[in-house]
């Protein structure tokens, strides 16, 4: 019985730091928040300017293995909508999964490439994953957004 109690206590004491090691500390969350917001704003700026070759470099390794640079750029050019910016009504939020994996939840204002007055706001969750010391985006998600067609069309 004493061995069982000792084993349980050791398991709790030794296992507890491992469980908490996966969650960022408040200081780490603040640093991650600042870093990812800058990365996200930079990525959004590239998207606004339709600089798809540079966006591709910010893609996750898995995405780049599936999509070639040419495929990605072609699919992005074919999209009718580009972001104008972030909605001022609701600030972006970060949903942490681990120190190296998070979702940036943002309300993005999109504008039609041909009809500039046609705009809409859509909430989007962007997956960011840290690879080789840099935050990377899911490019597959990018070629599918924003999926909107005006009513009465």
Annotate each predicted stretch with a short phrase.
Residues 17-21:
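Sec/Tat signal peptide C-region and signal peptidase I cleavage site
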Residues 23, 28-31, 37-38, 42, ...:
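Short solvent-exposed beta->alpha transition segments
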């Amino acid at each position: 019985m004493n061995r069982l109690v000792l084993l349980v206590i050791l398991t709790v004491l030794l296992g507890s730091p491992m469980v908490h090691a996966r969650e960022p500390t408040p200081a780490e969350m603040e640093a991650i928040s600042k870093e990812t917001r800058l990365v996200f704003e930079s990525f959004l700026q590239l998207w606004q300017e339709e600089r798809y070759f540079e966006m591709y470099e910010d893609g996750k390794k898995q995405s780049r293995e599936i999509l070639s640079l040419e495929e990605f750029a072609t699919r992005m050019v074919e999209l009718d909508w580009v972001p104008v910016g972030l909605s001022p009504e609701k600030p972006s939020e970060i949903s942490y999964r681990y120190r190296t994996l998070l979702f940036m939840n943002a309300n993005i204002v999109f504008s039609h490439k041909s009809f500039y007055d046609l705009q809409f706001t859509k909430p989007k969750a962007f997956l960011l994953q840290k690879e080789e010391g840099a935050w990377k985006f899911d490019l597959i998600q990018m070629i599918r957004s924003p999926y909107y067609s005006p009513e009465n069309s």
